[in-house]
Amino acid sequence: MSIKSKNKLRQHRKIRIRKKIFGTADQPRLVIFRSNLHIYAQLVDDITGSTLLTTSTLSLKDNGINIRANKSGSTLVGKEIARLAIEKQIIKIVFDRNGYLYHGRVKAVADGAREGGLKF
């Protein structure tokens, strides 16, 4: 399967998922973006269209943590987004895998967020 068709299928899955899930200020949407070098996680309030919190392997590297975008690094990103959310009294979230399969790095972010104290 070519890269173009793989990305096109992911975009169709993304649209299908976004029709069903919705984040609010009390229960924001945790969105995952995966690139070859980094993984990003952000909490989004869909009512106002604003990003409440964000973290990534890139921001953790800036803080002095030696991290890569593998499963262990993704778990750390999940724990960090959970820590930041709990500081803002956000406990419940809606998980948006952004069209990616719930496997590998995406699952590791979700598991890290659960370990950090977030409820899906």
Curated annotation (Swiss-Prot):
GO molecular function, one term: structural constituent of ribosome
InterPro entries per UniProt: Ribosomal_uL18_bac-type, Ribosomal_uL18_bac/euk
Cross-referenced Gene3D superfamilies: 3.30.420.100
A GO BP annotation: translation
GO cellular component, one term: cytoplasm
Keyword Ribonucleoprotein: yes
Keyword Ribonucleoprotein: yes
Subunit (UniProt): Part of the 50S ribosomal subunit; part of the 5S rRNA/L5/L18/L25 subcomplex. Contacts the 5S and 23S rRNAs.
Protein family according to the UniProt entry: Belongs to the universal ribosomal protein uL18 family.
Classification via HAMAP family: Ribosomal_uL18_B
Protein's name in the database: Large ribosomal subunit protein uL18
Originating species: Lawsonia intracellularis (strain PHE/MN1-00)
